[in-house]
Curated annotation (Swiss-Prot):
CDD domains per record: EF_Tu (cd01884), EFTU_II (cd03697), EFTU_III (cd03707)
Location of the region described as G5 in the Swiss-Prot/TrEMBL record: 174-176
EC number(s) from the headed UniProt entry: 3.6.5.3
Species whose genome carries this gene: Myxococcus xanthus (strain DK1622)
Protein name as annotated: Elongation factor Tu 1
Assembly: Monomer.
Subcellular location field: Cytoplasm
Residues bound to Mg(2+): T26
Region feature (G4): 136-139
Location of the region described as G3 in the Swiss-Prot/TrEMBL record: 81-84
Domain spans labelled tr-type G: 10-206
């Protein structure tokens, strides 16, 4: 196999297949690898290779995910596909597989089904920004009017969850036919058409280094003769010596200047996304800062206590709770580097939440945390993880 083809000289995009069980997500994933393999952009992976997804553990949660990579003439893609519905829920909520866009697979024979809806809702809640639709199994429909009806249903459903339903590309085809080598419109050409839509409709994501600087504070030291140093791994952006930053979260926001950046005991002129650094800050004492705060570009992030979230509650088998929880539940919420206690408000018609459930909740923290939409967190009880969540909306 020509290995040297996979050079990282193309923009990289993370995508995944979502949609109802048995609508053809895994067959489509296999078909993409088969069709792109013809131009050397992929290694063909048969259905059963993708379907036997290895289990991974992300924050103590067991998730089965298949990772496939391939490239078009414009881009390099990492593609995730999950065997079971529960795996999708966990994957999207934990952010284990961050998606820049998704391919929603809908069977033309069945139309949108309950998990179609749930995956679109999850995509909205966890911040999957773009969706392209593959209308699968169109060979099972004789009536073109029926296909148009299904297409309209899908567009309406997307609009209901605030996706631009009218503008989203919907590509009709048959993943199975493409796998069989069919060269009619619904076979291999449909897969190529789908990839063109993915290439053009899903924008290249902003690189981590281009985003505003943020570093979660892991520890704070006082170094005699030098001052106060905050250590942590830069989550995004770049910090240059002499730049102003804000210390956000847990206490009133303070401004300071980074007067030095160290890495492996060497002085640098900047730290960037992915670096573990020590940042020397001007005019702050060791007791002015603590783990759980963040250093950030001024104005880029603010502290909040009330937010809406989508959470997945670990099952007993995953080491989660053995019993349900009710309204007024007060666990700790672990954001980045620290736990903050908060109280949970359940949706109106929900009395209790069972282990293994996935639900939208409202949280009020006792101290403010630097947060924004799409921030991931763990739900913990005395240091034990009992759930995973993502901020869907900030209230105050």
């Amino acid at each position: 196999m020509a290995k040297e083809k996979f050079e990282r000289n193309k923009p990289h995009v993370n995508i995944g297949t979502i949609g109802h069980v048995d609508h053809g997500k895994t067959s489509l994933t296999a078909a993409i690898t088969k069709v792109l393999a013809k131009t050397g952009g992929a290694t063909f992976l048969a259905y059963d290779l993708i379907d036997k997804a290895p289990e991974e553990r992300e924050r103590g949660i067991t998730i089965s995910t298949s990772h496939v990579e391939y490239q078009t003439s414009n881009r390099h893609y990492a593609h995730v596909d999950c065997p079971g519905h529960a795996d999708y829920v966990k994957n999207m909520i934990t952010g284990a597989a961050q998606m820049d866009g998704a391919i929603l697979v809908v069977s033309a024979a069945d139309g949108p089904m309950p998990q179609t809806r749930e995956h679109i809702l999850l995509a909205r809640q966890v911040g999957v920004p773009y969706i392209v639709v593959f209308l699968n199994k169109v060979d099972m429909l004789d009536d073109p009017e029926l296909r148009e009806l299904v297409e309209m249903e899908v567009r309406d459903l997307l609009k209901k969850y605030e996706f631009p339903g009218d503008d989203i590309p919907i590509i009709p085809g048959s993943a199975l036919k493409a796998l069989e080598g069919d060269t009619s419109d619904i076979g291999e050409p449909a897969i190529l058409k789908l990839m063109e839509a993915v290439d053009s409709y899903i924008p290249t994501p902003q690189r981590a280094t281009d985003k505003p600087f943020l570093m979660p504070v892991e520890d704070v030291f006082s170094i005699s003769g030098r001052g106060t140093v905050a250590t942590g791994r830069v989550e995004r952006g770049i910090i240059k010596v002499g730049e102003e930053v804000e210390v956000v979260g847990l206490r009133p926001t303070q401004k300071t200047v980074v007067t030095g950046v160290e890495m492996f005991r060497k002085l640098l002129d900047q730290g960037m996304a992915g670096d573990n650094i020590g940042a020397l800050v001007r005019g702050l004492k060791r007791e002015d800062m603590e783990r759980g705060q963040v250093l950030a570009k001024p104005g880029s992030i603010t502290p909040h206590t009330k937010f809406k979230a989508q959470i997945y509650v670990l099952s007993k088998e995953e080491g989660g709770r053995h019993t349900p929880f009710f309204k007024g539940y007060r666990p700790q919420f672990y954001f980045r580097t620290t736990d903050v206690t908060g109280s949970v408000k359940l949706p109106e018609n929900v009395e209790m939440v069972m282990p293994g459930d996935n639900i939208a909740i409202e949280v009020e923290l006792i101290t403010p945390v630097a947060m924004e939409k799409e921030l991931r967190f763990a739900v913990r009880e005395g240091g034990r993880t009992v759930g995973a969540g993502v901020v869907a909306e900030i209230i105050e």
